[in-house]
């Protein structure tokens, strides 16, 4: 059983067929089994919907369908961004003034630490700077 965190990069590449990473991400998706578990956050899903909001009706519809599906999928843990989690992310954001981490990245990193996750479906090298293993280098 794999335990994976899923970043905005992955969801967008999965949906957007013109994304240069689409083929690799789609192929990886085929390897996810019923025993695997994945985590993402409300903040990540907000980024996905925001990024695809002006990409046309079809893609917007697919993005909403993806989010709706993730929210009910028993393999997927969509972590709610509570005030406490927001403040944890903000604390990391504040502690790394020399980095270019987004607040969403900081929230994701805090969730990964809390859940003991080490692998993330992203190409964002910021995660390697915090000791995580990105699966799309």
What is the meaning of each model-derived region?
Residues 1, 109-137:
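Acidic, PIN/NYN-like endoribonuclease modules and their adjacent C-terminal/linker elements
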Residues 1-40, 55-68:
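Short, well-structured N-terminal submotif of metal-dependent ribonuclease cores
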Residues 6, 39-40, 80, 103, ...:
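Short beta-strand scaffold positions
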Residues 9, 49-50, 90:
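Amphipathic alpha-helical segments within well-ordered protein domains
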Residues 34-35, 73-74, 130:
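Structured helix-beta-strand junction loops
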Residues 50-54, 113:
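Short glycine/serine- and small hydrophobic-enriched flexible loop segments
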Residues 76-119:
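Active-site neighborhoods of divalent-metal-dependent phosphate/nucleic-acid chemistry enzymes
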């Amino acid at each position: 059983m794999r335990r994976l965190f899923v970043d905005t990069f992955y969801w967008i590449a999965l949906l957007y067929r013109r994304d240069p990473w689409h083929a690799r991400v789609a192929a990886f998706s085929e390897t996810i089994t019923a025993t695997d578990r994945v985590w993402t956050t409300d903040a990540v899903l907000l980024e996905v919907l925001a990024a695809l909001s002006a990409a046309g009706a079809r893609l917007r519809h697919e993005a909403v369908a993806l989010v709706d599906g993730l929210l009910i999928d028993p393999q997927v843990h969509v972590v709610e961004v509570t005030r406490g989690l927001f403040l944890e992310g903000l604390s990391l954001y504040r502690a790394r003034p020399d980095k270019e981490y987004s607040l969403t990245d900081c929230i994701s990193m805090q969730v990964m630490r809390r859940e003991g996750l080490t692998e993330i479906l992203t190409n964002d090298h910021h995660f390697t700077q915090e000791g995580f293993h990105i699966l799309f280098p």
